[in-house]
C-alpha cells in the first residue's frame, strides 16, 4: 500500500479529513503518517519529537503498525517523548484496565522508547490537582506537542473532556458521565459501577495547543460525533469541534464514521486529498 503525505506535510493550514474504506486502512495511514512526522523532525534537528497518545480500542491497529515498523528497523522511538492523555482515578497501575497497563501492553513494551521519556498521569497521586499541574508543566517544558494522536467518543468528546467541558480547559480532574461509564463498561465485566467515577485528563486547550492534531474515528457509532465536529458549530457540547479552530487538524475516518456528513462535504474532502496529492 502506498502512502502519500506531501499535501499534509507542506500545506496543513486547516482541518483535513482523510477517508479510508475501513479502520484497517485508516489505521495504517495514521501509523505511516506519524512515522513520517517523526522522521521529518529527526532529519533537521536533534530535539525529541513530542507526541500525545490515546488509549481504547481505536488506536490498537495504529500502534501495531508502529511496532512492526520499529521491529523492522524502519522507525525508532529513541528520540521520542510521549504523554498519554488520561488515566482513571483510584485504579491501581497494575490493573489490566489502567491506561498504564494498556499502553505497555499495546505499545511501550514493544518499541524502543526510553522509559524516562514515557509519561502517563498518575491517578493514584496523593494530590491529584498537583499531579495535573505538574503534568501540564512537563508538556510545556518538553517543548509542547509536535503531534497529538487522539480518538473521539460517541458524544464527540476528546480525551475525557466530556460534553460541556470548557474549550479552554487544561489538565485536570473530571467526573465521568454515566454515558461514558456505560460505554467503557465493556472493559470492566460489562458493569458500569466498576468503571471509576473520576479520571485525570489533558484539557481541550492542552490538545489544541499541539502543533498538529490527528484524530482517529472509525465505525458507525462515531458518525454523529463526526458530523457535529465537522459541520456543526464549535461548541463545548462536542469538544472535538474545537478542532475547527486548529490550523493543523486531521481526522482519519472510515466510510461508516463519515456516513452522516453531507454528500458535498464528503466530496470536498475526497477532492482536496486527490488534488493535493496529484
Cite the ranges covered by each PLM segment.
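Ligand-binding beta-strand-loop-alpha-helix segment within the catalytic cores
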Residues: 8, 75-149, 270-278
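Glycine-rich N-terminal segment of FAD-binding domains in flavoprotein oxidoreductases
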Residues: 40-71
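A glycine- and small-aliphatic-rich helix-loop capping segment at beta-alpha/alpha-beta transitions
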Residues: 64-76, 99-101, 163-172, 232
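Glycine-rich phosphate-binding loop
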Residues: 143-168
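Short beta-strand segments
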Residues: 52-56, 84, 121-122, 149-152, ...
Amino acid at each position: 500500500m502506498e502512502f502519500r503525505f506531501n499535501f499534509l506535510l507542506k500545506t496543513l493550514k486547516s482541518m483535513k479529513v482523510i477517508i479510508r474504506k475501513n479502520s484497517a486502512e485508516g489505521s495504517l495511514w495514521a501509523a505511516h503518517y506519524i512515522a513520517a512526522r517523526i522522521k521529518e523532525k529527526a532529519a533537521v534537528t536533534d530535539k525529541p519529537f513530542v507526541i500525545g497518545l490515546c488509549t481504547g480500542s481505536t488506536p490498537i491497529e495504529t500502534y501495531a503498525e508502529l511496532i512492526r515498523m520499529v521491529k523492522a528497523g524502519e522507525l525508532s522511538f529513541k528520540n521520542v517523548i510521549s504523554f498519554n492523555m488520561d488515566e482513571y482515578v483510584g485504579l491501581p497501575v497494575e490493573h489490566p484496565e489502567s491506561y498504564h497497563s494498556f499502553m505497555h501492553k499495546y505499545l511501550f513494551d514493544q518499541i524502543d522508547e526510553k522509559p524516562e521519556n514515557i509519561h502517563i498521569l498518575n491517578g493514584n497521586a496523593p494530590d491529584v490537582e498537583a499531579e495535573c499541574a505538574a503534568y501540564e508543566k512537563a508538556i510545556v517544558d518538553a517543548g509542547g506537542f509536535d503531534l497529538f494522536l487522539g480518538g473521539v467518543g460517541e458524544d464527540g468528546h476528546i480525551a475525557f473532556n466530556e460534553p460541556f467541558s470548557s474549550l479552554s480547559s487544561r489538565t485536570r480532574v473530571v467526573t465521568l458521565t454515566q454515558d461514558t461509564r456505560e460505554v467503557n463498561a465493556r472493559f470492566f465485566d460489562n458493569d458500569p459501577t466498576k468503571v471509576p467515577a473520576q479520571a485525570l485528563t489533558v484539557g481541550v486547550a492542552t490538545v489544541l495547543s499541539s502543533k498538529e492534531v490527528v484524530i482517529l474515528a472509525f465505525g458507525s457509532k462515531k458518525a454523529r460525533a463526526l458530523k457535529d465536529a465537522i459541520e456543526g458549530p464549535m461548541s463545548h457540547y462536542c469538544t472535538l469541534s474545537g478542532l475547527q479552530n486548529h490550523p493543523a487538524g486531521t481526522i482519519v475516518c472510515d466510510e461508516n464514521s463519515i456516513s452522516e456528513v453531507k454528500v458535498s462535504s464528503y466530496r470536498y474532502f475526497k477532492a482536496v486529498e486527490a488534488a493535493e496529492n496529484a
